Amino acid sequence: MATTTSLLSSCLCALLLAPLFSQGVDAWESRQGASRQCRFDRLQAFEPLRKVRSEAGDTEYFDERNEQFRCAGVFVIRRVIEPQGLVVPRYSNTPALAYIIQGKGYVGLTFPGCPATHQQQFQLFEQRQSDQAHKFRDEHQKIHEFRQGDVVALPASVAHWFYNGGDTPAVVVYVYDIKSFANQLEPRQKEFLLAGNNQRGQQIFEHSIFQHSGQNIFSGFNTEVLSEALGINTEASKRLQSQNDQRGDIIRVKHGLQLLKPTLTQRQEEHRQYQQVQYREGQYNGLDENFCTIKARVNIENPSRADYYNPRAGRITLLNNQKFPILNLIGMGAARVNLYQNALLSPFWNINAHSVVYIIQGSVRVQVANNQGRSVFNGVLHQGQLLIIPQNHAVIKKAEHNGCQYVAIKTISDPTVSWVAGKNSILRALPVDVIANAYRISRDEARRLKNNRADEIGPFTPRFPQKSQRGYQFLTEGLSLIGM
C-alpha cells in the first residue's frame, strides 16, 4: 500500500512538474493564440467597475468585458481583506500572479501529492469555566508569510487561501492568464470555491462574460453520498455546502488563526528531515523534493534587489523564471518600477508579452504608439488605475511631480523589453552611418544621438526644468531626451 501511495504521489508531481522543467515548448508559444480580430486602436485607463462585499472584505472587478482585457487574455481583480479576514480555500482554471499592494499575513497553497510535513500542537479548553484541556496535533502543507511588495504565484487548479494576520487591511491585486495552456476549459476565468459562497457576486455578474463563483463545489453533491465519502454525518455535510451561510467568500476569524511560524533554523531542519524521510521510504526521485518545497512567494519591492538603479531617477526590479522558477508553471512574469520626481523611463517596447500596468502610488504620464506610428494612449495614470500595454507597442513614461511606483504583470515567464535609448539600447547598437542616413542628420548629430544617455539604462534623470505643469510638450521632451 505504501508503494502504491508513493507511486501515485510521484506521478502527480511528475504531471504537474512537466511544464516546470520541460524545455521542449518554446517560450514564445506558451499561450493560446489571440483572436486575429483584436485591435488596440484606443487604449484606456481602467479602475474597478464592480464591488462585491463579503463579511470581512471586498472583491473589486475590473471591466473584464472590455475588448482590451479579452485580447490581452487577462482577468484582473483587487481584494481588500480586513484584519482577521480569511479568503476561503479555492482554485481557478487559470494561473495567476497576486501582488501585495499593502498589508501582511499568510497564504497557503496545497499541491497534490505533497505530504503534510508541517506540524503544530494546539491546546484547547472545552469551556472557559472548565480547567480541562485537550491537546491535538495538526499536520498541513507549508504556509507562506506575505508582506507588502510580494508576488505570490498561484498555479492553475492548485487550491489556495489568504489570511490577513496584520492590524490594517491587506490589498491584493490578482492578474489571471485566461489564455494559458493550463486552462483546458473555455477562455474565461472560473473560480471553484472549496468553502463559503458568493451569492451576491453571482447576482451582480449574472450577465458577465466571466463565470464568477456561486455556491462551493460541495453543493453539487448529494448530502448522503458526501457524508459517506468523507465519513461525516449529514449535518456536517450541510455545513460543508455552506447552506444558509451569508458571509460570502472572505470570512472573519473571530479569535484569529493559530498558525505555526517556524524560524529559519526550523525551516532548514524540516527540509533536512523531509529529505531523510524520502530517502528512507524509497520515494525520493527529485520531483517530489523540487515541487513540494518550491518557492511560491518573492518580494520585489526591496531596493537591494533592483536590476536597474539610477540614484537620481529610480529603480527597476525584474521577475522572471530564472529568479522565480515557479513562473515556468504560471507562464507569467513581473516588473516593479519606482520613478522619482519628474524622472523618465527610456522609450521601450515589450518583445514577447502584453503588460498589465497597475499604479501603486503617485502618477505617471504615459504615451503609447502602435505600428503605424499613431498614438493609442496619451494620458496620466493615477494610483489605483490600470493600463494594458500590448506587445511590441512603443512606450514612453514620465513621472509627475509626486513620483510614481507601479507593478507590471507580463503574460510570459521570461519577459524581455527592448530599450530605445541608453546603455544596451537599440540606438547604441546601430552604426553611426545607419542612424545618420535613416534620420537625415549629420554624422556628428548621429554620434550624439547614439551616445546620449550612454551611462544610463532604464530610469533617466530629468534634464529639463518644468516651468509649469501645463506648459511642456511631453512628446517633444521625450524625443529630446534621446537627442532628436
Swiss-Prot record:
<dbReference type="Pfam" id="PF00190">
    <property type="entry name" value="Cupin_1"/>
</dbReference>
<feature type="domain" description="Cupin type-1 1">
    <location>
        <begin position="43"/>
        <end position="238"/>
    </location>
</feature>
<comment type="function">
    <text>Seed storage protein.</text>
</comment>
<feature type="disulfide bond" description="Interchain (between acidic and basic chains)">
    <location>
        <begin position="114"/>
        <end position="292"/>
    </location>
</feature>
<keyword id="KW-0758">Storage protein</keyword>
<keyword id="KW-0732">Signal</keyword>
<dbReference type="InterPro" id="IPR050253">
    <property type="entry name" value="Seed_Storage-Functional"/>
</dbReference>
<dbReference type="GO" id="GO:0045735">
    <property type="term" value="F:nutrient reservoir activity"/>
</dbReference>
<dbReference type="InterPro" id="IPR006044">
    <property type="entry name" value="11S_seedstore_pln"/>
</dbReference>
<keyword id="KW-0708">Seed storage protein</keyword>
<dbReference type="InterPro" id="IPR006045">
    <property type="entry name" value="Cupin_1"/>
</dbReference>
<dbReference type="GO" id="GO:0048316">
    <property type="term" value="P:seed development"/>
</dbReference>
<keyword id="KW-1015">Disulfide bond</keyword>
<dbReference type="InterPro" id="IPR014710">
    <property type="entry name" value="RmlC-like_jellyroll"/>
</dbReference>
<comment type="similarity">
    <text>Belongs to the 11S seed storage protein (globulins) family.</text>
</comment>
<dbReference type="GO" id="GO:0000326">
    <property type="term" value="C:protein storage vacuole"/>
</dbReference>
<dbReference type="InterPro" id="IPR022379">
    <property type="entry name" value="11S_seedstore_CS"/>
</dbReference>
<protein>
    <recommendedName>
        <fullName>Glutelin type-D 1</fullName>
    </recommendedName>
</protein>
<feature type="signal peptide">
    <location>
        <begin position="1"/>
        <end position="27"/>
    </location>
</feature>
<comment type="subunit">
    <text>Hexamer; each subunit is composed of an acidic and a basic chain derived from a single precursor and linked by a disulfide bond.</text>
</comment>
<feature type="domain" description="Cupin type-1 2">
    <location>
        <begin position="298"/>
        <end position="447"/>
    </location>
</feature>
<feature type="disulfide bond">
    <location>
        <begin position="38"/>
        <end position="71"/>
    </location>
</feature>
<dbReference type="InterPro" id="IPR011051">
    <property type="entry name" value="RmlC_Cupin_sf"/>
</dbReference>
<keyword id="KW-0926">Vacuole</keyword>
